[in-house]
């Protein structure tokens, strides 16, 4: 069973226990709306019930196709940007390579990066592509897919199309193109915004190809769904309440801080989830990320003594991820006081010291998980999606649209001569 808890440390006298509890109570109405799922957002709530896109029949379909691919594949190139790759990439980077390597493409317009991609592919024997796009007008995955199709045609000849799986919206131009070309197809859920697709084929299929336990992910998400939908003693409500209280007090930036470097990509997923969902109508917190202990040497001074615009949310892993004990080489280097200590212990002391110092300036929100595995990631994905929905209702914005992101795209397409 997965474990997740929420608490806060505050030695800045910002929160009083009574004030926080009163605000949580005020927000119960928002919780109840999110627990039910609002009718006006029905066309966006395909993620709200985990079984809708991660039920038994769907899991069998993902696993069956993944098993077919795994018989020959040594490398899966996942083409996608933003919500089309962030969740899968978060799990892959955190838990490490399993059986099949995943290479991520279609997330940059850098010629240098594209050349490096093809140099890397020259080292691989049997390559498959999973192109993921809800709206196939997005430039990065579109041109990457074309470039990689050309590469596969040269490498495999007439049978190149058997190496391509697409996850597209059904009955669109791109879906029909895929069927005409003989590509294998999976549906991109039409009723889920891209950043909420962590428990759908968008994320689960490539992870299944790579050898991850997607049933454990589903199990963790289902447990979290049951917990959040059936309790008012609710960590998602507590987190949403705390962060919106801080926003209302004048804070403008939420910094998600971790002491485990392999969670870097999860931070990127979180940043898109909250940035696109909450940042509209002149409202919302700017989501940023910090990777400790390294970033303590760049951001620590600002957080301790700079503009009071920032607060922190810590994502903390309770059980050590790994172990490495510091030995001795007999040299007096000034570090004998930590001889024999485990790096995990030292890292945890740094975490506790950071909380102690930073919480004297602002409240530190703390989300604690027991360990890093597929079940925990399923739980985390659902928790943050649910909490984000609550936060957006409290803030007074529609969580599921992102019209603002089209502004730069429209200018870019015009400059490139798109008709």
Which residue stretches match the model-derived regions?
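Generic C-terminus detector
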Residues: 378-419
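Helicase-primase coupling helices
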Residues: 288-373
């Amino acid at each position: 069973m997965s474990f997740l808890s929420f608490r806060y440390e505050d030695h800045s006298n910002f929160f009083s226990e009574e004030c926080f509890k009163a605000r949580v109570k005020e927000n119960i109405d928002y919780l109840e709306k999110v627990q039910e799922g609002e009718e006006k957002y029905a066309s966006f709530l395909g993620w709200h019930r985990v079984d809708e896109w991660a039920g038994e029949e769907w899991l069998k379909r993902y696993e069956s196709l993944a098993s077919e691919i795994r018989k020959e594949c040594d490398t899966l190139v996942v083409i996608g940007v933003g919500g089309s790759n962030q969740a899968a990439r978060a799990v892959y980077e955190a838990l490490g390579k399993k059986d099949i390597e995943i290479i991520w493409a279609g997330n940059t317009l850098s010629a240098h990066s594209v050349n490096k991609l093809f140099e890397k592919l020259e080292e691989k024997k049997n390559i498959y592509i999973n192109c993921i796009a809800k709206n196939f007008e997005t430039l990065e995955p579109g041109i990457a897919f074309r470039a990689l199709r050309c590469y596969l045609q040269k490498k495999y000849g007439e049978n190149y199309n058997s190496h391509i799986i697409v996850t597209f919206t059904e009955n669109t131009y791109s879906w029909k193109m895929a069927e005409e070309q003989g590509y294998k197809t999976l549906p991109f859920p039409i009723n889920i915004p891209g950043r909420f697709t962590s428990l759908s084929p968008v994320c689960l299929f490539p992870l299944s190809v790579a050898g991850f336990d997607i049933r454990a992910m589903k199990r963790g998400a289902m447990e979290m769904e049951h917990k959040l939908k059936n309790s008012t003693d609710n960590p998602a409500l507590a987190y949403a309440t705390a962060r919106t209280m801080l926003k209302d007090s004048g804070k403008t930036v939420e910094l998600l801080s971790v002491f485990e470097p392999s969670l870097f990509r999860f931070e990127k997923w979180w940043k898109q989830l909250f940035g696109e969902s909450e940042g509209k109508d002149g409202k919302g917190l700017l989501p940023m990320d910090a990777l400790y202990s390294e970033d303590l040497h760049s951001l620590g001074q600002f957080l301790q003594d700079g503009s009071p615009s920032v607060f922190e949310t810590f994502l903390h892993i309770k059980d050590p991820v790994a172990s490495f004990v510091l030995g001795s080489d007999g040299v007096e280097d000034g570090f004998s006081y930590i001889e024999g200590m485990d790096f995990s212990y030292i890292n945890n002391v740094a975490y506790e010291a950071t909380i102690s110092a930073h919480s004297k300036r602002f409240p530190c929100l703390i989300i604690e998980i027991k360990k890093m595995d597929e079940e925990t990631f399923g739980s985390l994905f659902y928790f943050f999606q649910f909490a984000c929905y609550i936060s957006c209702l409290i803030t007074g914005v529609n969580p599921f649209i992102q019209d603002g992101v089209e502004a730069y795209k429209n200018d870019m397409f015009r400059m490139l001569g798109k008709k």
